[in-house]
Amino acid sequence: MPSKFSCRQLRETGQRFENFLVDRGQDRETDRERLRTIYNQDFKTSFGTPAPGFSSMLYGMKIANLAYVTKTRVRFFGLDRWADVWFPEKRRMKPGLEMSKHHRSLLATIFHDRAEYMHGKHGVNVEVQGPHEARDGQLLIRLDLNRKEVLTLRLRNGGTQPVTLTHLFPFCRTPQFSFCNGDRELPCLLGPGECYELHVHCKTSFVGYFPATVLWELLGPGEPGSEGAGTFYIARFLAAVAHSPLAAQLKPTTPFKRTQVSRNPVVTRRIEEGERPDRAKNYDLEFSLPLGTYYPPPRLRQLLPVLLRGTSIFTAPKEIAEIKAQLQTTLKWRNYEVKLRLLLHLEELQMEHDIRHYDLESVPMTWDPIDRNPRLLTLEVPGVAESRPSVLRGDHLFALLSSETHHEDPVTYKGFVHKVELDRVKLSFSTSLLSRFVDGLTFKVNFTFNRQPLRVQHRALELTGRWPLEPMLFPVASRGVPLLPSDVKLKLYDRSLESNPEQLQAMKHIVMGTTRPAPYIIFGPPGTGKTVTLVEAIKQVVKHLPKAHILACAPSNSGADLLCQRLRVHLPSSIYRLLAPSRDIHLVPEDIKPCCNWDAKKGDFVFPSKKKLQEYRVLITTLITASRLVSAQFPIDHFTHIFIDEAGHAMEPESLVAIAGLMEVKEADNPGGQLVLAGDPRQLGPVLRCPLTQKHGLGYSLLERLLTFNALYKKGPDGYNPQFITKLLRNYRSHPTILDVPNRLYYDGELQACADVVDRERFCRWEGLPRQDFPIIFHGVMGKDEREGNSPSFFNPEEAATVTSYLKQLLAPSSKKGKARLSPRSVGVISPYRKQVEKIRYCITKLDKQLRGLDDIKDLKVGSVEEFQGQERSVILISTVRSSQSFVQLDLDFNLGFLKNPKRFNVAVTRAKALLIVVGNPLLLGHDPDWKVFLEFCKENGGYTGCPFPAKLDLQQGQNLLQGLSKLSPSTSGLKSHDYLPQEREGEEGLSLQVEPEWRNEL
């Protein structure tokens, strides 16, 4: 029966009830049943007029975003102050030996408090005999290959009273160690001066780092219950190491020391600005729609540290509870703007924190040798060529003279970037600084990031409220209005699509336009030709719809350039590529320069008027540059079609930049424009830095949100509804073997291997394969992940050396001197950690004589998974890097962090066309379900080599281990337990710094 109360009345009643609770001092009550009792017995009797039922009132408060409601709890507050997001995905259960949280905590205690376990107690200590080095709390045994070393660990009672050795636990999962403790059975009594020997045998046929831990459990002196009696523990941490010569050269140069983020930015009360690059020149595109600043609320900045602590919604202070509730509420149209705005603010606050890690102390600047107006200073910025940090023309940074850092009121100099050359930036500063400048003057430098992408995303969210976009962003149906007759014949520009029914189907539905106002999605798994399909659809729209005007976008410049290159073949005079003025013209492909806004005669970018741009049938931009068309207020009905390639890479607000203000949904007989999204939700999404935005949904692209949560795009018993979505099935890139695992894991086994047979089988007979005709190698390496200097990023010397060895085999010169059998351009090396990327590059360009001597070795790309998305190579090598420093870390619920990501795994293994080589720690990777499937696939098909493949832990051995460790409780050991692993957390801020993703440089 419908409620007799309106939503407004329900909301007003709820607000009066909330005030009623405040007046009675009961506003902290969250139990739903107790609140029901208060409402029915106390509040309703004092209400004065008929009041709605308790559940109806809660419903009114919930839909008004004024309460967070579960089956048992209720919390009242104003959600619209901050905004809310959707529930995080359920975490995967981890495979392997089932250990309770208690047991994991006890094992973690061993490693985390290892200094405590290494101390002798009651006069009992461990003597070590045999070849070893004591380093960082470990006994390091250096091994030559296939030569045995024996270490004796002698537990000696040096006290005055007897003790009892009750248990001995050797923790090791690798065959490099074997333990022998003689014939003495446990428990055994050790009188004063007596000892118990454990012989540790070490031998390996493989290079690597092999950890083990030995734990002795003893019963202290004295009668049970007397002073001094009780269980105590002593441990020793071992590591057998066999290095290759190359790995020995890659050891840490300096000990790792965590960087302290500067709390004292250089911006002071007095700021003097340099001269900005002249961007108004050649600019005829009128800006008539203002762009706000959209800074994060100051109060949100203050609350962020508390927000990150993980307090419960029902016990947190009210402001914190409000935000937390919003971060756990489903995304709906009614909260769309405020929710996504909150997430953007949180991401920006994390960016502000992360950018401080690039600040420089006491760095010199020099005069730019080229005499120009204005005079520029040159600053060396390591990493800027790789956008770490991103510095573009027009950006700014702050500099403070090193000699004035302790002055009471120093001047901060704001320098504007005029030019970027590799790792050098050229800056304009105020004339007062230039008048006193001499070469070599040193500065403290603070970097900033370009807020333009954030600002235009905020404006796009604002514009969603001005234009009726709900039927497009939260579609429920198609209006079924076609743009062309159903019997129209389409003559294809690319005849290859005729033999691909999925590509043909997608293209026809897009041209017909019957999906409107809902977006059409091209779901394109790796190598299936989604961009080819999208480009053909654009060409057909131009051909068959004479009044159509198209905006074609991608998140990246490379993606937009590719669209331009492929469209230009048949539409040379109909397209125009609009580049941002910060783009380095040297990076723009030569073949698209004639149809972009670069004026070669002027040597500068030009921006034609709105009237001129409207004459082109197709405009091509990045998503962010599309904001210039919004600022120019193109007519809302000018663009009939908006195509977004790589749509899965973009945050939803970023996709909105090219939609809100440029397209609307109209009445039923004219559904308005057609939005087309092409991408793959199973591959990497947007790169985010903030743990809260990662957890609560900003990582969802518009494409992935629709595919995941909207019924129109769900897969049914007969597949997807072709009126709204087409999944491409024919892979034109990879050998079937390389495609096998990702196909089964992520694409329901539907992908068909259609790559050219000659190309894909190029390495099936390569002598380096463990098994012929199986072009995948998993090379097991038990390495050690290291860090050095102030970089939190990990590297693994042994893996880097192994990768280098494979590269030498692959690129070995043929009979022609200096000419490689395989071009370095055809090879890619992927590693998730920035420091490992640096080490591998160092190996191939500096350390290895054979590789560094190749003329084109610099064409061999080494980079992160993100840097390879959308790319392919004949050969891909992957170094996974992470390993372990102790058995405890290795065998527990190890935090794989950056590796434990199905999308990242999928992208990494699907870049290869003909040969895939993975170098990593099989024992560690086997804890992840996807890596485990891949490992077993390699093992079963003969593609595994390297260190022995780990056997499964015997179930009874595991039970005995747990039973013994159950005695390791804090109450008996006197040591505190830990609910976390000793491994440094890889969520929150730590992960983004270890991986060090590129900073955005696409405008």
From Swiss-Prot:
Its EC number is 3.6.4.13. The modification Phosphothreonine is found at T160, T254. Keywords: Acetylation, ATP-binding, Cytoplasm, Helicase, Hydrolase, Nucleotide-binding, Nucleus, Phosphoprotein, RNA-binding, RNA-mediated gene silencing, Ubl conjugation. Ubiquitinated by the DCX(DCAF12) complex that specifically recognizes the glutamate-leucine (Glu-Leu) degron at the C-terminus, leading to its degradation. The modification N6-acetyllysine is found at K148. CDD domains: DEXXQc_Helz-like (cd18038), SF1_C_Upf1 (cd18808). It is an enzyme of class 3 (hydrolase). GO terms for molecular function: 5'-3' RNA helicase activity; ATP binding; ATP hydrolysis activity; RNA binding. The modification Phosphoserine is found at S432, S969, S977. GO terms for biological process: 3'-UTR-mediated mRNA destabilization; miRNA-mediated gene silencing by mRNA destabilization; miRNA-mediated post-transcriptional gene silencing; positive regulation of mRNA catabolic process; regulation of neuron projection arborization; regulatory ncRNA-mediated post-transcriptional gene silencing; transposable element silencing; transposable element silencing by mRNA destabilization. It is found in: Cytoplasm, P-body; Cytoplasm, Cytoplasmic ribonucleoprotein granule; Cytoplasm, Stress granule; Nucleus. ATP binds at G524, P525, P526, G527, T528, G529, K530, T531. Its main location: cytoplasm. GO terms for cellular component: cytoplasmic ribonucleoprotein granule; cytoplasmic stress granule; cytosol; nucleus; P granule; P-body. Residues 921-965 are annotated as: Interaction with AGO2 and APOBEC3G. InterPro entries: DNA2/NAM7-like_C (IPR041679), DNA2/NAM7_AAA_11 (IPR041677), MOV-10-like_beta-barrel (IPR049080), MOV-10/SDE3_DEXXQ/H-box (IPR026122), Mov-10_helical (IPR049079), MOV-10_Ig-like (IPR049077), MOV-10_N (IPR049075), P-loop_NTPase (IPR027417). The keyword Nucleotide-binding applies. A motif (DEAG box) lies at residues 645-648. Residues 968-1003 are annotated as: Disordered. 5' to 3' RNA helicase that is involved in a number of cellular roles ranging from mRNA metabolism and translation, modulation of viral infectivity, inhibition of retrotransposition, or regulation of synaptic transmission. Plays an important role in innate antiviral immunity by promoting type I interferon production. Mechanistically, specifically uses IKKepsilon/IKBKE as the mediator kinase for IRF3 activation. Contributes to UPF1 mRNA target degradation by translocation along 3' UTRs. Required for microRNA (miRNA)-mediated gene silencing by the RNA-induced silencing complex (RISC). PANTHER family: CANCER/TESTIS ANTIGEN 55 (PTHR45418), CANCER_TESTIS ANTIGEN 55 (PTHR45418:SF1). Interacts with DICER1, AGO2, TARBP2, EIF6 and RPL7A (60S ribosome subunit); they form a large RNA-induced silencing complex (RISC). Interacts with APOBEC3G in an RNA-dependent manner. Interacts with TRIM71 (via NHL repeats) in an RNA-dependent manner. Interacts with both protein products of LIRE1, ORF1p and ORF2p. Interacts with TUT4 and, to a lesser extent, TUT7; the interactions are RNA-dependent. Interacts with AGO2, TNRC6B and UPF1; the interactions are direct and RNA-dependent. This is Putative helicase MOV-10. It comes from Bos taurus.
